[in-house]
Each structure stands twice: as structure tokens, then as C-alpha cells.
């Protein structure tokens, strides 16, 4: 796949914050990803759906919401492991940020 300026413009459309204009009406460019990574619409929608319909702890209870959340969490971990070619999905650990991951 050849990456062109059109490719980047298509990707930018997925990130609502990157539609903003800043100083001198220029497109916002965000490079501080070690601190906070901007979210595409797909992530915002998934998070919103989770909080509205499935919000619960994982691996902590046997009620419906906890079971749904645990299943979704483990499916996501499996997908990430497959994408990264990791044999055991338990090696995939989600952390809140770079500092927590390093520590």
C-alpha cells in the first residue's frame, strides 16, 4: 500500500480533534502521544457503548454485565495477541499509559 497525502487526510477524518483549526487557521497537528493519544471515532464510539451498556469490572463477578465485560476484554486481548503474533494472549497486558507500562 502506497501512503499518500490523501491517505493521511482519510486517517485524519477518523479523529474528531484533528478537524480543529488552530493558530492562523492551520490544521491541528498533535505529536504529544507519549502523554495522551488522540482517539479515533471508532474508539470513542466503543467506549461510549461500553459505559452506556456494559460498564462493569472484569474477572470479578458472575453477573451479566461482568460476564459481558470479561468476555469482551478477553476477546480484545486475543485479537491483540494475534495481531502481534504472540502465542499466549496472557502475555498481553493493558496499562493506562507509558509510565505505568515502563514501571
Name each region found by the language model.
Residues 1-103:
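Pyridoxal 5′-phosphate
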Amino acid at each position: 500500500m502506497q501512503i499518500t497525502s490523501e491517505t493521511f487526510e482519510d486517517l485524519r477524518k477518523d479523529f474528531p480533534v484533528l478537524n480543529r483549526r488552530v493558530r492562523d487557521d492551520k490544521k491541528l497537528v498533535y505529536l504529544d502521544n507519549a502523554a495522551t493519544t488522540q482517539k479515533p471515532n471508532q474508539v470513542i464510539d466503543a467506549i461510549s457503548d461500553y459505559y452506556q451498556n456494559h460498564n462493569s469490572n472484569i474477572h470479578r463477578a458472575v453477573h451479566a454485565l461482568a460476564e459481558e465485560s470479561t468476555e469482551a476484554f478477553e476477546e480484545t486481548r486475543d485479537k491483540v495477541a494475534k495481531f502481534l503474533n504472540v502465542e499466549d494472549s496472557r502475555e498481553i497486558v493493558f496499562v493506562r499509559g507509558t509510565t505505568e507500562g515502563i514501571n
